[in-house]
Amino acid sequence: IGSDQVADLDGEPLGKPGDHARAVLQLRRMRGRWVVFQTAVAVVCQASGFEQLDLAPVRVRFRDLSDAEIEAYLRAEQPYDCAGSARSEGLGIALLEAIENDDPTALVGLPLIRTCRMLRAAGVQLLASAPPGAGLE
């Protein structure tokens, strides 16, 4: 199983900024706008030859962030390894006004609903093979 994500701002890909200065620029460009985070997932089983890819788009509307909010967020989270400089599972959720998608885990970076669907297609019976204590009691 592999997954990765890129932010799409009006057709322009915004990847992982890598440093503070690039993160500031990304967040300034996205403030007050809709951005689509495209999360790709792949399931490959070499033994059976199964391969499947899927894409989980997530539309996100950023708040109209002030420069001070952007600086405070970046100093606290340092999301320089996150597409679009936003880590929604942390303080990054405070940057957002709205999220639209069909898989709430996709924005975090691994669309689990799609991944489970792909694993079932590969013949993996997720619930049948769950060990005692796996939270399915």
How should each PLM-predicted stretch be described?
Residues I1-E137:
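Anionic-ligand binding patches
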